[in-house]
Every structure is written in structure tokens, then in C-alpha cells.
Amino acid sequence: MTYRNQKLLEAVREAPCMACGVEDGTVCAAHSNQMRDGKGRSLKASDYRIAALCFKCHSELDQGRKMSREERLNMWEEAHRATVGWLFDNEVISLKR
């Protein structure tokens, strides 16, 4: 089942780009492009598999030609980990006790 959370996607818009650090108002949730994360022909991955990326980095990730497939995967994974850290550090995500 695919997880959806609009509040999470909106919160990511407040983060800096986790690839280049820019805070230019274009940052949004870039979903994983990997099948293992639920990506399908007409399906986005779950909302918990996102990375905060600016328009430029998101475009390069999805349609760019500057990086190899492996480099794109590594870029997204690093940005995803940084995004999860940012979400916890900024108390967007917290643990229930």
C-alpha cells in the first residue's frame, strides 16, 4: 500500500535543497524513482520515500544527462537521508511515547 501524507509534502517545502543547499522557494518533495520504493509505471513512491530538492536538482535527477544512473541514485539516497534528518531536527516527525 502506498503511503500518502500532504502535511509531510508541504513541510518539505520549508527545507533547503538537500543536494545543493539552495533556499530559493522551489524546493519540493522528490519521490524515489526506484521500484523497490513503490514506484511504478503510473505510481509515485510512498511519501516517506522523498528528498527535499530544488527545481534545478530535481530536474537534473529526473531528466538530466550530467549524471550516470548510479550517480543519480547516490544523489537521491544522500538527499533522502538528509531530508529525514531535517524532518526530525525540525520536529516535523517525532516519536510517539
Locations of regions flagged by a protein language model:
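Short, intrinsically disordered, charge-biased short linear motifs at domain edges
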Residues: M1-E10, G38-A45
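Short cysteine-rich loop/turn motifs with clustered Cys
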Residues: Y3-A30
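Cys/His-coordinated zinc-binding microdomains
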Residues: G21, F55-H58
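Short recognition patches in nucleic-acid-associated and regulatory proteins
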Residues: G25-R41
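Polybasic, low-complexity binding patches
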Residues: G38-Y48, S59-R97
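Active-site cofactor/substrate anionic-group-binding motifs, chiefly glycine-
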Residues: A51
